C-alpha cells in the first residue's frame, strides 16, 4: 500500500493522567498514567491494532481519539489539524468522521429507545439522512450487519450480546465515518 503525504490521524506524545484523591478533604496525591507518551500515525485504508494487557490504556486511547475524553498533554491531528484547538462546531463535524464501536454494546445503546430511534437519530441530527430517506437508510444499515427489519421496533435488552454488537456497528456506520475505533468489538 502506498502512503499518502499526510496521515488521516496522527497522535503525538499523547498523555492521559487521572488524579488520585485521598483524605477526608480529598486532595490529589498522585496520578494514574493511563496513557503516557503514545505516538502513532494512521493513513487512509490502513488498519492499526493496539494490543496489550487489561488496563494498559487501549480504551482510553480510543476515547481520546473520538473526543470522548480530553488528553492531559499531546496532540491529535486529523488531516494535519489539531482537534484539541477546534471550536465546538468543528468538533461536532469531526465526530461524524470518527465513530466508536464500544466494548460493551449494552451500555452503549439507550435502553429507552427502539432500535429505529437509535439508528435514525444520529443520521437526522447530522444531516446524513432526511425525513424522506431515513427509514430506507436505517433498513439498509440493518441489512449490512445481518439484522432483520423486525428489529426496528424492539429495545436493546431484547437482543443477544452479539446482536447488540451488530446494532452498535450499524450505529457507528450510520454517519458514514472515515475512521472507526473498535474497542474489542467481538468480545460479546
What feature does the model see in each segment?
Residues 169:
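Hydrophobic anchor residue at the start of the ABC signature
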Residues 74-82:
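Conserved ABC transporter NBD signature motif
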Residues 133-150:
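Conserved ABC ATPase "signature" region
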Residues 176:
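Conserved catalytic motifs of ABC-family nucleotide-binding domains
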Residues 51-52:
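The feature captures the beta-strand-to-loop junction immediately N-terminal to the Walker
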Residues 66:
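Helix-to-loop junction immediately C-terminal to a conserved catalytic motif
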Residues 155-159, 163:
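Conserved ABC ATPase signature
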